[in-house]
Amino acid sequence: MTLKEHKTVHEAQNAVARQAPEHFYKSQPSRGGFIKDISEYERLYKQSIEDPETFFSEKARELLHWDAPFSKVSYGSLEQGDVAWFLNGKLNASYNCVDRHAFANPDKPAIIYEADDEKDNYTITFGELLRRVSKVAGILKSWGVKKGDTVAIYLPMIPEAIIAMLAVVRLGAIHSVVFAGFSAGSLKDRVVDAGSKVVITCDEGRRGGKTVHLKKIVDEGLNGVDQVSRILVFKRTGTEGIPMKAGRDFWLHEEADKRRSYLPPVPCDAEDPLFLLYTSGSTGSPKGIVHTTGGYLLGAAMTTKYVFDVHPEDVFFTAGDVGWITGHTYALYGPLLLGVPTICFESTPAYPDYGRYWRIVERHKATHFYVAPTAMRLIKRVGEAEISKYDLSSLRVLGSVGEPISPELWEWYNEKIGNNNCVVCDTFWQTESGSHLIAPMAGAIPTKPGSTTLPFFGIDACIIDPVSGVEIEGNDVEGVLAVKSPWPSMARSVWNDHVRYVDTYMKPYPGYYFTGDGAGRDHDGYYWIRGRVDDVVNVSGHRLSTAEIEACLVNHENISETAVVGINDELTGQAVIAFVSLKEGYLQNDAPEGDAEHITPSNLRRELILQVRGEIGPFASPKCIILVRDLPKTRSGKIMRRVLRKIASNEADQLGDLSTLANADVVPAIISACENQFFAEKK
């Protein structure tokens, strides 16, 4: 049914669909096996929705090596939360990413390492990758790691992170990568929840010219965690004096010398877990998202091939970290499944200067560049002059990931980086989806600046009215984005908490998968992503739970209550703003330095930011902490965050209906506090 009250997708009215530029087609190595135009996409998409059994069985056999064939393509339903794909089929992820390419073309580059210091760059071939993966797998096997065990990986974006992941799954074990920017406490929470007995890390990391003391963080986080019996440590910097606990800590290079150069992979059931990846949840506690082997690998391979138009001769550059899903799917699994070199980038776009990305593209003749809008906003603001110094003509496809990209930034990206010669693929997907949900297929689907265009094969996308829960038919509608049927790469569960999985994704709208994002579908059926509709903030493409940040802040002994909201930010997409009310009599504006009983506002803010950095990580730090007397609440005691979000967005004249507030009198004081503590500092 079409609901008249739903707004039209206004920004789409003047957006013109664009065909791929001529340069894109001329620079393609070949067209065999790819989608040639939108009519072919529509035909195949229709088949993928109406006859998924035939469609996905053909693709699974084409793109993956199976040790034993699957007997049934799919089973289960969204409503029951019991989805399974490729039942009884057996395969190994490490074999599919490494062995088959090493046997066919051992000297072909597999991992192109771009180190923090460019003097440390090197390349690993598929043949060498097989040897190194086998040796690390041999170490883990000697320690008793077996099929179904979890192994935690706390490494920066270096080849050893990819090698460790592939070594774990070679044994049929489950990797749980923890982003190396997370604090000791966050690492501990994830290691304990996953039940990991082995942790893989390094002595130190290097990022932006700075040293990150990773082994020290691991030691702090795992202090008293008796379940961890072994820690494998890669020597990244070689700094002397790294503490090593006898019987628990072992150097990777010393242990690798004891192992054979080839270890056979363990065949896994298609539904065996491949990895856990913790993501922010609206309840505050991180969720260990479970992805399984067969379906996830197919999603990674298919989307990399068809969305990005990837050919064997290409070089793929994902400027993302394996600590997040983008690094998993499009820096590791997608490219390596297709036998394509992947660039492993350890540093930042600003180190040693803003030409770093473009030197990488020029040096390795990268054909694909995939990055979050945050990085492009930064370069647009302060690093644009560097772009023209480099030859970027090898690029054919530009990707955007992690958050919606504005039409203006899309145009800049297309013109300045692509020289109007590339296809820009704005992709929408999630940790839970495993691979792209909605994205243009380069060269086949015309693009529109600001739109993620059309659903990928098998993604039966729809728009739901958030009030009635009824699907909204037709075009030019707005609502909540959902998916009507299962797809191979979707997450299967939350680790040790399947009820939470069903409650979070399947129960909000029974019979549908709830993405948590709002969206519009324009007059052409193209999708426009609006952002989160739940209590999750997207900062620089990283999803952060507002509840987790609130729980961290309220741990401060003199904080009474706190509410965290996300607002639009020119650089990071969204920014974290924290409203904090204090216990009576705690704060004193004129407290003398060193006063033990009171604290100044600036000192308190500093304390709270350090608390967030220490407990969660620097990337979760609030942009501003606003101290208030009280928070706006309904008569049932619920904090009205939409009011705080409007105030922090400088939209106090658009607060809407406040009749349900029990303490509407606090609103003017909050507006004043925001004026003095946030807006005044921005001027």
Swiss-Prot record:
GO molecular function: acetate-CoA ligase activity; acid-ammonia (or amide) ligase activity; AMP binding; ATP binding
Domain of life: Eukaryota
InterPro entries associated with the record: Ac_CoA_lig, ACAS_N, AMP-bd_C, AMP-bd_C_sf, AMP-binding_CS, AMP-dep_synth/lig_dom, ANL_N_sf
EC numbers on record: 6.2.1.1
Any Gene Ontology biological process: acetyl-CoA biosynthetic process from acetate
Catalysed reactions, as listed in the record: acetate + ATP + CoA = acetyl-CoA + AMP + diphosphate
Residues involved in ATP binding: G402, E403, P404, D426, T427, F428, W429, Q430, T431, D517, R532, R543
Positions of CoA binding: R207, G208, G209, K210, T326, S540, R613
Disulfide feature: none
Keyword terms: ATP-binding, Ligase, Nucleotide-binding
Gene Ontology terms: cellular component: cytosol; nucleolus
Gene3D superfamilies: 3.30.300.30, N-terminal domain of ligase-like
Matches recorded under NCBIfam families: Ac_CoA_lig_AcsA (TIGR02188), PRK00174.1 (NF001208)
Homology family: Belongs to the ATP-dependent AMP-binding enzyme family.
Name listed for the protein in its UniProt record: Acetyl-coenzyme A synthetase 2
Organism: Candida glabrata (strain ATCC 2001 / BCRC 20586 / JCM 3761 / NBRC 0622 / NRRL Y-65 / CBS 138)
Originating gene: ACS2
